[in-house]
């Protein structure tokens, strides 16, 4: 869709009619009206008790589907809920999270790492040899105006549920935390996208070509084949 035509499909109240064909070949008409909807990619946040050999552990579960700024307040509320409930373990469900804002990914990783990672490397941004002067390090911080809420107290490791749809900013969080705490992956192998882009505009056209890679505090990156799970479990959601 050309940029000049975007208002035709993004303005609220626009009515569009579609003819679609089902798997059986039968056609039917659909009418859709555009509207504004509140967005949040936090679909579930809860705390449950898990029996252990030492007794019972309070485990927080967070299903997070996209790194968008609109989810900031919901993430903040979720972490407040986890702390109030006394959660000491976290299951972070990124099965369907294909990425999004690197700034928000840094905020989430910083909240998980807490004071032990504050000021440490979140991502070492590397351009090619012709643009090495643009390289920079993005540090962990709990004071960036994004996700200023509480860190999860007492967290020493994190369990992440993954799938082939786990990509980009999701993998960035996994890779960033690994130098500082155990990150246990459960599910499927992730997508494998250790690269990013900075949009460039030329002659009225904006290009989003890949132009940098990301490394963690140990210089680890280039996970083009994705991260393999520590415990492989097939997704039972069709």
Language model features with spans:
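P-loop NTPase catalytic core of nucleic-acid-dependent motor ATPases
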Residues: 92
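C-terminal, low-ordered peptide segments at domain boundaries
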Residues: 2-87
